[in-house]
A protein has these predicted regions:
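Helix-to-loop junctions at the C-terminal end of transmembrane segments
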Residues: 67-79, 163, 268-280, 365
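Helix-loop boundary and gating motifs at the non-cytosolic
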Residues: 6-61, 218-257
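Symmetry-related core transmembrane helices of the 12-TM Major Facilitator Superfamily/SLC fold
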Residues: 170-187, 374-389
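A late C-terminal transmembrane helix in Major Facilitator Superfamily
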Residues: 337-366
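Juxtamembrane intracellular "pre-TM" segments in multi-pass secondary transporters
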Residues: 2-16, 192-225
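Structural signature of the two symmetry-related core transmembrane helices
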Residues: 82-96, 282-297
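Intracellular juxtamembrane helix-capping segments at the cytosolic ends
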Residues: 39, 119-132, 321-334
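Cytoplasmic helix-loop-helix junction between adjacent transmembrane helices
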Residues: 113-148
Length: 399
């Protein structure tokens, strides 16, 4: 009888759709995009040595990787909604420490922010796999990219501009976005997701689900697609600006190219319509082949630098396309009872690519000019295209 006086929208929680999750992803992107170009500058000001900054990035990458692998273990004791809220809290604590102006606090602040990113990414992917049907995953990825496009186009330039006005300003703005992210998450009332249990409880240590991951070739292939795609973005974001400076094109050229590449996210609805008429295998192959060939073409730019810039910018179109469809093979292969654990494994692609890319680039630069890094990246992308050819030919096709 008491329920009679409770509003319907409070008694019956609406099932979240792809658009609601896309909004969450877009608000998370607003936090990260505001600070993505600020952290390197603040880190360099605090540490005063590029080599020390590189070492900090390397160590933070390892810490973030370990954090991601421990999230499912912690999730056995902490409800998922509180794990997500904890990630949002790290988005507040990290920038808060950076605003103190203490040089020793900056690396720690960056590490906490990265831990927040990893935690939120894992929880969000677990929720998506709980509530979104396999047939709607591609639409969900398209909407996430489209909703995040404005943040990634404006955020990097806005963050640096605000920092020049007053150094704490971009951190304050990012904290405001984080508060809004937490508020939207709680209004969605996702709870702890759908609880699907096995007959026997899984092993409590993180190595157990790594072994399960290693026994599933489809998951390994899907994870490799994410790692190699992320390596392509690493080369584009880090080494294109360096190439432009060495080639005499100026410091602004690389930044302009990155902003224009992020604006390509606005084309994700068009990409999605193309994807709807193709299978996942063909879409993933197309993305890797296009990006790989254009990265190889950029190696010719050693003699004519504008060619390299143009080829790499064109390759970023295919990288954006892969952001939309490259994760589908993994998401479609995950067993319902392993969603939380495999979401943690999947999230490690960012940290692994952040460790692998600088290492390979360092080895290449010992024997070749900077354009050799583009060639190595192109070869890796084409290798991923060959691997994509082994996907099921009807994966993602509507039945």
């Amino acid at each position: 009888m008491a329920n009679r006086n409770i509003p319907v929208h409070l008694r019956h929680v609406p099932m979240p759709g792809v658009s609601r999750f896309a909004i969450l992803a877009a608000m998370d992107a607003a936090v990260r995009a505001t600070l993505v170009s600020v952290w390197p500058l603040v880190m360099y000001r605090a540490l005063g040595d590029a080599a020390v900054v590189s070492r900090v990035y390397f160590l933070v990458g390892i810490a973030a990787l370990l954090t991601g692998l421990m999230v499912p273990w912690a999730g056995r004791f902490i409800p998922r909604r509180w794990m997500y809220t904890g990630g949002v809290s790290l988005y507040l604590i990290g920038p808060g420490l950076a605003m103190t102006g203490e040089a020793a606090m900056v690396p720690f602040a960056y590490m906490l922010t990265c831990a927040g990113t990893v935690t939120i990414f894992i929880c969000l992917n677990a929720y998506v796999m709980d509530y979104i049907a396999r047939a709607d995953l591609s639409r969900g990825e398209s909407l996430k990219i489209f909703y995040s496009a404005l943040s990634w186009t404006i955020g990097p330039m806005l963050g640096v501009t605000l920092m020049h006005l007053w150094e704490p300003l971009p951190f304050i703005l990012a904290a405001c976005f984080a508060l809004a992210l937490g508020a939207v998450f709680w209004t969605m009332r996702l709870g702890n997701g759908k609880q699907i249990a096995r007959a026997r409880a899984p092993a409590p240590n993180p190595l157990a689900y790594l072994r399960r991951f290693a026994r599933q070739p489809r998951l390994i292939a899907g994870w490799l697609f994410a790692v190699i795609r992320s390596c392509g973005w690493w080369v584009y974001v880090v080494y294109l600006p360096i190439f432009c400076i060495e080639a005499g094109l100026g410091e602004q050229t690389g930044g302009i190219a990155l902003s224009l590449s992020n604006a390509l996210m606005l084309l994700s609805p068009v990409m999605f319509r193309w994807l709807q008429r193709r299978t996942v295998r063909r879409a993933v192959q197309t993305g890797f082949v296009g990006a790989g060939l254009l990265f190889l073409a950029a190696t010719l730019g050693q003699g004519w630098p504008p060619l390299a810039v143009g080829a790499l910018w064109a390759a970023s179109f295919f990288l954006v396309f892969l952001d939309m469809c490259g994760g589908l093979p993994f998401l479609m292969a995950v067993k319902p009872s392993e969603r939380a654990e495999m979401a943690a494994v999947y999230s490690s692609f960012r940290d692994v690519s952040g460790i692998v890319t600088p290492g390979i680039a360092w080895a290449v630069l010992l024997v070749a000019p900077l354009a050799g890094v583009f060639a190595a990246c192109g070869a890796g992308l084409l290798g991923a295209a060959a691997l994509a050819g082994r996907l099921h030919p009807r994966l993602g096709a509507r039945r």
